Amino acid sequence: MNRTPFALLPCLLLSLTSPESAPAVAAEAGDILLADFEGKTYPEGWKVEGTAFGKAPARGTLGGQMHVSGFEGKGLVNSFLGGDKPTGKLTSPEFTIERDYITFLIGGGGHKGKTCMNLLIDGKVVLTATGPNTQPGGSEFLNWENWDVRKYKGKKAVLQIVDDASGGWGHINVDQISQSNKQAKKKPAPAPARGRGGNPQPQNAQEIKITGKYIIFPVSNRGQRGRMTIYVGEQLVHNLDCDFPPNKDAIDWWTYLDMAEYVGKTAKVTARAAPEICKLFESSDKIRHLQPLYDEALRPQFHMSQMRGWNNDPNGMCHYDGEYHFFWQCNPAGRGWANMYWGHATSPDMVRWTEQDRALRSFGGNVKNRHPKMAVRNCFSGSGNVDLNNTAGWQKGKDKTMVLAFTDTGCGESLAYSTDRGKTWTYYEGNPVIRHSGRDPKLMWYKPGEHWVIAVFDQDREHGRNIAIYTSKDLKKWERQSNVPGYFECAEIFELPVDRDPKKTKWVIYAADARYAIGHFDGKKFTPEHKGKHRVHWGQYYASQCFSNPPDGRVVQIGWARINIPDMPFNQTFTVPTNLTLHTTEDGVRMFATPIKELEALRKPSPKTAENKQLTAEAPAVQFDVKDQLFDIVVTLKKGTAAKGVLRFGSSAATYDFAGQKLDEMPLKMKDGQVTFRVLVDRPMYELIGGGGACFKTSGRRDMGKPIGTISLTAEGGSLTVESLKVYQMKSAWKRD
């Protein structure tokens, strides 16, 4: 019986146990255990693809998920990491079929070929099983399934656990896979709860007089998920799932929904929540804070993060008339993936952000009289731009029309527009403008051809996963032009000068993982000039996007920092904005990502410094005692005999390997025997930038929220020279001077 080890997942999982998660039952004599997922990493030889399965087994229920039960022990495969949107595969090493049956526990989505476990022999699927759920409601209960494999005895086989679905029940749960000569007996399923997500509460309805900008209500980090709907008159205004506390003692934080346009009217609010919780709902001009806003213990201080709830992908990024507009995938009413509203913030400099009313709302369904911001279903990712030439004909006054392109999961690729500088948004009545199997459109104006371009993830038999290119003259009618194979989710495409020469430009294309290709684009077709993809970004980085219509020609990128921030009224955050450039290197033209210069305005004066400092066996370190947690550290090291140079900041570290020429896991070549890197340290996270932007890593801190204490540079295995070390303390972007 082979129980093999597992790969580390940095704190993205909620560690919850239950009566069903009792110690694993020992396999019956003669059984062959293939995997029980009890270790800290996936079993040896199991291959992970995509993002849905993370890097290690789940420990029960994940953030934003209904209660998971029926698995054995403490671990299981659970692809709800980040919600139903992420996809991926988990493939076992090859094994020999030696018993009559393969038995396993399975639950989650019931989409054939999409959320399933397959048995492959000679590369072909011979048996498959799915979870039981395809419709809203359902249960996250795992039950036994048996495959009769007697006719395959002696053959080599592979197991493949698949999550290739992104809508409702777009995930799969699997546990305790064994070979046996006996079939496992199904367990009685738990009684269905009266509310979604194990919520036993009835629906409660009440009327609330709208006297302020918001309806505010309490949330619990381990609450009972229930549906809330808000009508004003006959109009559907909000319809979302909320993590309600079971009682007053379980309140962790308060959130809000925008209601300013209805002041003076009465809203009918229906919620599946405890009566004592429903009584706390109120209209208010103020959001209730149980911790100081933007100064919570783990709040990033110079990285954008939303006031309340979960965030994932950056969306809609554009500039108009002196303001940067930043949007994002947002769950206003919980710390896990759900609901997919679009948050919205504005900034004059991409550093100091002010949150605005949320721009888009999900789950309008087929209700004709719904709020103008509401989509049919989820508002998945997309982009933004400014219709400077009024090609769509929506402009009403002197202000240009701002346009959002996004995926409405109940409709297709859709548009919303604003004629008042982003204050209000209208869902285009002609949606969808593109109907296909993909999502996450990037909207771009192609000036040489005087037409719009949408680059969007697609998937078909001919091209597999790809970026599809569409064009339009008026934003409303679109033609498909070409496909770029080998990309998944959140497409981005833009033009950059090489070595800052405006007469020598190339185009860059990438998708959610930020691995990019360089080539040529004629407005309809992208042609790469090399095989494969290149890489700048590493670590907990995903789904980045660049600002459209920039005022100074820069291409500035922001990514989703996939960092779990525990026990806060918000979860996840974003990277610092980075300026993208193309440079000629000894390996060819490569893209660099450098933090924008505007961040340097947050540096406090009088940095701690060291120059031309020799580190030897007798004096192997230079060390500074520091206060606070916010730092910008810039290092230049000169090679000596040391194997490594290590920068430590609190419990975290960045290591340069002189022999391997790597900065942590990132390849980074020295120049003239020297290497330069920079670390931006914030309360829950840090970013490591090597070689002036040749590589860029995003990571959570090991000691989130704790004072750094000391910053040190150490030579390991010999000597080196600290050519320069500068440690700047940083100011908070939330605190106005």
Question: Where are the regions that the model predicts?
Answer:
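Beta-rich accessory regions
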Residues: 202-218, 224-234, 261-273, 290, ...
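Hydrophobic core segments of beta-strands in well-ordered, beta-rich domains
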Residues: 104-105, 159-161, 217, 269-270, ...
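Extracellular carbohydrate recognition
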Residues: 165-181, 275-282, 719-721
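Extracellular carbohydrate recognition and processing domains
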Residues: 121-169, 200, 218, 223, ...
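Surface loop/turn signatures of beta-propeller and other carbohydrate-active proteins
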Residues: 127-139, 188, 195-197, 236-254, ...
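Extracellular carbohydrate-recognition regions
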Residues: 27-56, 183-193, 295, 597, ...
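Extended extracellular/luminal ectodomain segments enriched in beta-structured repeat modules
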Residues: 85-87, 95-103, 154-157, 208-216, ...
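Short beta-strands within extracellular/lumenal beta-sheet-rich domains
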Residues: 74-103, 112-113, 142-146, 198-209, ...
